[in-house]
UniProtKB/Swiss-Prot annotation:
GO BP, one annotated term: transmembrane transport
InterPro entries xrefs: BPD_transp_1_N (IPR045621), MetI-like (IPR000515), MetI-like_sf (IPR035906)
Signal peptide: none
Domain annotation ABC transmembrane type-1: ranges: 95-292
Protein name as catalogued: Glutathione transport system permease protein GsiC
All ranges on the Cytoplasmic side of the membrane: 1-8, 124-134, 190-228, 299-306
A Pfam family this chain is assigned to: BPD_transp_1
Biological role stated in the UniProt entry: Part of the ABC transporter complex GsiABCD involved in glutathione import. Probably responsible for the translocation of the substrate across the membrane.
Periplasmic side: 30-102, 156-168, 250-277
Subunit annotation: The complex is composed of two ATP-binding proteins (GsiA), two transmembrane proteins (GsiC and GsiD) and a solute-binding protein (GsiB).
Amino acid sequence: MLYYVIKRLLGLIPTLFIVSVLVFLFVHMLPGDPARLIAGPEADAQVIELVRQQLGLDQPLYHQFWHYISNAVQGDFGLSMVSRRPVADEIASRFMPTLWLTITSMVWAVIFGMAAGIIAAVWRNRWPDRLSMTIAVSGISFPAFALGMFLIQVFSVELGWLPTVGADSWQHYILPSLTLGAAVAAVMARFTRASFVDVLSEDYMRTARAKGVSETWVVLKHGLRNAMIPVVTMMGLQFGFLLGGSIVVEKVFNWPGLGRLLVDSVEMRDYPVIQAEILLFSLEFILINLVVDVLYAAINPAIRYK
């Protein structure tokens, strides 16, 4: 197992290098001139050229790439073109709000999604199944930005129960986490149901029932563990999606996180911040997939990695 983990970690190096090259080329292909945006609409050509020199944009593209890669290897992603603060500080100040929002969304989505999926599988083709799957399909189909605006209108504007802007208290997390986790809970419910339906028809489940084991114990002990392997895969992918895909939700709720920072950076063509954030998201997905693979062995001891 240790050899497998080390091998996967070493595989990060070429993957992140390829991502770095693609991201660098992508951000420099974006339309618009960062120097013009920073200098302002009233700036003349001389001022814009001076800003370009200060930002290093007057140098050849290969020279900019080498400077970017050599510094990134040392953990230095440069200065933000907009705030002139270190990119690492910009990301660090926004990371925790996004992480806590992701964890909050994932916790309730897993609890309610798995519960709905198990109920739908146990009472298959009956009203609990139909009700759960109808809600799940609705959750998948409803756009996150529309759900967010609907929740703001009802619970903040009309009722005045919950705040909409900021991340200072636990009340601020309720509406964004509901919005962000709705689609994940819906996918979790459908995935859990499909996995449980297959498990419930296995021979060992019928054997447990024949031995007089209660249906609740059969479902929770024998069914849940064996149905968890594909569900854990989906959980890992969804967690990475939440962590890196909260852009729309953060924009709707003006959340001080990485998603909003990325949107603002794209609008201002802040190349260093864009490159660092996409690299961070790529690293998160790779590490989450590694954790999921390791969890396989914990859930099912029959699985071993060589």
